[in-house]
């Protein structure tokens, strides 16, 4: 067991970065405990794991570079992913001298020259890595009957080699020169502009790796997350220090469950229990709210200022607010929306009249109790209890079963809506359910956060909900919402993880109607992905529900290719349904078809 003597200094680092209003603050847990699976880290990083945050997370240098006119970078993320050529202190000292010499009004060219001298291009901290356990012909290919789909499976399996990344040794030796968070093992990254690991993306990436028999790579990625929890007390949104104030949907325990199911390595889960418990407690202690006498959780962030990776965009939307306090609250809502993974969506809009109308100025993420987060936490508690049962820890089994039961009761009494026939997010401002479709309304089905004895009743109400909202009418998959706002997590965009939650959730109901719809939607998703790949040779981050075989759009950046979670979901469904799906079989979708 590795002692973390300097972890309390992390709290000091955090306290220097947190400057939210009283309405938005919450305390951090005690991070002074010993943990299994902790790894030694570079001494300098241990002293101040966020040493580079003075460059990449906040301050006048960040603000000046990111708001330069004309702008220096098309994408705000470019700058905060660059490597420092000097120490943070030296860089700040010389920046301040330059600002003084330019009377605090440097030109865009002055700033460009400064960046060119003091920073190196993004990605220099990483090198391409071919996973050592990659197999040319993994066994899932034998489960695919259609020859075209089988060849596609071969090509998808090869993409893992394209997405492999390994951090250079200098990152762990000099972490203060980088925004990237050092981890001990290589990773599979999402792709495109996302050249580092991301938390919830990794769940579906790891599932795909396991089906590809890449057990060592999958285990290494999970162990990276263990090391991060054991150093920082939680898993940031992604592998950069500028994500320090927020996490993403808590799926680490689910990753461990997936690994154990494939390998039967119960010891791996048992040894990880302290870490998994700590992450669970981080969420329930720091994201909790009380609604109708139930303790449930919301998405929220603990940092101040705009998102560094979208700095210019946040400053621009913040200009709509009249005071610094109002701007800060808006930045908090933006980052809470990012923690949800759905950045951004009308799901998080609360208009003055209590609807989901508006734009980003209406973001109220921290005032919405989300179905998915609470369902995931229920699942975490159940899995932790299961792992303790394997270890023979009967007291801990009872403790976490009790936690799960309390969460389930809250989900049932606050979030289940009898009239809608599904679960609905809850608006704490207007004290009412939010009756707007989003796939997460069905997320309890995926993690079995419902009474199995009521499966028939729930199935009937869910199928009626699908019919009422015409969710089966989209040729390119089921969209994330039915609102066309231009945000990337609204219509017409459709995302692999949300299709997965819908399909696997319906299958878990185990009724003929639900299972048939599950297979129909899985087939449709495989085919629209195949059509897009056949045409463009890309797996996309998101797709267009209104058009068969077309990538998505909208949001703050161009649609990205790669793409980790899209690959993972397709590989899993080719493994599960490859004998049932053929290019010529029906799915309610046709090449070139558009929704009317």
From Swiss-Prot:
MF-aspect GO terms: alpha,alpha-trehalase activity
Keywords: Glycoprotein, Glycosidase, Hydrolase, Signal
Knockout consequences: Larval lethal in 1st instar. RNAi-mediated knockdown is lethal. Glial-specific RNAi-mediated knockdown is lethal. Neuronal-specific RNAi-mediated knockdown is viable with no defects. Conditional RNAi-mediated knockdown in adult glial cells results in reduced lifespan due to neurodegeneration. Conditional RNAi-mediated knockdown in adult neuronal cells has no effect on lifespan.
Signal peptide: 1-23
Glycosylation sites: 288, 293, 359, 451, 516
Enzyme class: hydrolase
Residue numbers binding substrate: 193, 200-201, 237, 246-248, 307-309, 341, 556
Known EC number: 3.2.1.28
Region (Disordered): 303-323
One Pfam family cited in the UniProt record for this chain: Trehalase
One biological process term in Gene Ontology: trehalose catabolic process
Name listed for the protein in its UniProt record: Trehalase
Organism name: Drosophila melanogaster
Taxon lineage: Eukaryota, Metazoa, Ecdysozoa, Arthropoda, Hexapoda
Gene: Treh
């Amino acid at each position: 067991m590795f002692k973390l003597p300097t972890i309390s200094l992390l709290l000091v680092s955090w306290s220097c970065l947190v400057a939210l209003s009283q309405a938005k603050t919450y305390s951090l847990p005690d991070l002074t405990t010993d943990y299994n699976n902790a790894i030694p880290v570079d001494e300098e990083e241990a002293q101040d794991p966020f040493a580079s945050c003075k460059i990449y997370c906040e301050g006048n240098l960040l603000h000046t570079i990111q708001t330069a006119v004309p702008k220096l970078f098309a994408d705000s993320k470019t700058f905060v992913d660059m490597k420092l050529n000097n120490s943070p202190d030296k860089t700040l000292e010389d920046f301040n001298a330059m600002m003084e010499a330019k009377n605090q009004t440097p030109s865009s060219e002055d700033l460009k020259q400064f960046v060119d001298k003091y920073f190196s291009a993004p990605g220099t901290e990483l090198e391409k890595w071919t996973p050592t356990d990659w197999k040319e012909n993994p066994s899932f290919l034998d489960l695919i009957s259609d020859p075209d789909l089988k060849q596609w499976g071969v090509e998808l399996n090869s993409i893992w080699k394209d997405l492999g990344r390994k951090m250079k040794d200098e990152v762990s030796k000099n972490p203060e020169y980088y925004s990237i968070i050092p981890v001990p093992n290589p990773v599979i990254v999402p792709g495109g502009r996302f050249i580092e690991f991301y938390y919830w993306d990794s769940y579906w990436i790891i599932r795909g790796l396991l089906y590809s028999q890449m057990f060592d790579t999958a285990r290494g990625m999970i162990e990276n997350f263990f090391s991060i929890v054991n150093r920082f007390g939680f898993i940031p949104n992604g592998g950069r220090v500028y994500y320090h104030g927020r996490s993403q949907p808590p799926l680490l325990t689910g990753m461990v469950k997936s690994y154990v199911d494939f390998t039967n390595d119960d010891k791996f889960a048992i040894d990880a229990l302290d870490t998994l418990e700590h992450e669970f407690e981080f969420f329930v202690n720091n994201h909790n709210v009380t609604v109708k006498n139930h303790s449930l959780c919301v998405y929220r962030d603990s940092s101040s200022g705009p998102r560094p990776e979208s700095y210019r965009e946040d400053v621009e939307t913040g200009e709509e607010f009249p005071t610094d306090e109002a701007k800060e609250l808006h930045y908090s809502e933006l980052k809470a929306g990012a923690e949800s993974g759905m950045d951004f969506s009308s799901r998080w809009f609360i208009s003055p009249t209590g609807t989901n109308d508006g734009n980003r100025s209406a973001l109220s993420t921290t005032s919405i109790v989300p179905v998915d987060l609470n369902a995931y936490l229920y699942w975490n508690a159940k899995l932790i209890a299961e792992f303790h049962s394997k270890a023979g820890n009967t007291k801990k089994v009872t403790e976490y079963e009790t936690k799960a039961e309390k969460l389930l009761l809250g989900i049932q009494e606050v979030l289940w809506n009898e009239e809608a026939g599904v679960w609905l997010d809850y608006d704490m401002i207007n004290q009412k359910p939010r009756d707007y479709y989003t796939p997460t309304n069905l997320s309890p089905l995926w993690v079995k956060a419902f009474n199995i004895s009521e499966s028939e009743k729930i199935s009937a109400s869910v199928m009626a909900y699908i019919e009422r909202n015409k969710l089966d009418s989209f040729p390119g998959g089921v969209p994330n919402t039915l609102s066309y706002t231009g945000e990337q997590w609204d219509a017409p965009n459709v995302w692999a993880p949300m299709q997965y939650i819908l399909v696997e959730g319906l299958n878990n109901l185990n009724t003929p109607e639900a299972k048939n719809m599950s297979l129909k939607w899985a087939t449709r998703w495989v085919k629209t992905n195949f059509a897009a790949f056949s045409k463009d040779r890309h797996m996309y981050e998101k797709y267009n529900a209104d058009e068969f075989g077309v990538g998505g759009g909208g949001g703050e950046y161009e649609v990205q290719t790669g793409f980790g979670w899209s690959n993972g979901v397709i590989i899993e469904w080719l493994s599960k349904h490859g004998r049932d799906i053929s290019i010529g079989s029906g799915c309610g979708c046709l090449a070139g078809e558009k929704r009317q």
